[in-house]
């Protein structure tokens, strides 16, 4: 079996273990599936945490990490025929998996069902093609980068017309009663030479697709804080010989979620090339959207992009992670005004999977009254 992702990290799993239960086919991918030791932590509803959201909602053991592992073992052992990745039983097992990465963090065996699902979808698309809905959502970075005005118009048209909304629900499965997120009227963009004095230090701000086109106020607020603290904030831009030098960079998350690995690898290469100055100069790279920034610290390793990925990982920080580090080292010295407002914090599932919510709570604790 030829895989789309690099599963070599699991190469030594199960050596000498007669009870490892590694499926007959699939190589290292099968070993990634077999790490499950059936502890059934994914069937817990009493513990705090993420895993497993589909079970917590349905209370059906069929929608747990363990059940999905069982389905993959059956598929890779030949129980689902010669084309297991197109078998409806495997599709049913994965249908409610939301790729939260909770199992990678909270499962005692660290089953990475998110990555297993990406490979599954890639294998399936290679056989039967990716459906229109998948291609529409996965290519969001392209639509926003190339056709932002057209996309803004199309979303406005769909949100403003009950008829079009119902048609989109029938064709694409997008709930008609829910409005689609609107693109901002003006996207976020830093000056090419950066902004700020740099008396405290220098950082690169990785403005992802969502921070750039949907919620630019978040990127602007982050920039304002960093500049006020004395940092020079530089944009991450494509290299001059990039195939699309005017299109923003992308972490590849939307492609990975939908099993379009080749496209994710393309975006990973673009971003890796653009961040070479940060790697060479050991300059921190700050991200705002957890699923985007953390994909560069995680899935990028599985795409065969070389040793540079590991070096880049050392320079990547979520905004609050960077502030917490700088504060601990005595460099971040901003004081905040009193606040009597109530702040409700909902940690991103990927943020929780990487233990990054601690930094978020720490930074919020600096605000008097919180």
Language-model region placement:
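Ferredoxin-type iron-sulfur electron-transfer modules in oxidoreductases and energy-metabolism complexes
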Residues: 2-148, 263-273, 308-313, 317, ...
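Iron-sulfur cluster-binding electron-transfer modules in prokaryotic oxidoreductases
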Residues: 3-5, 114-370
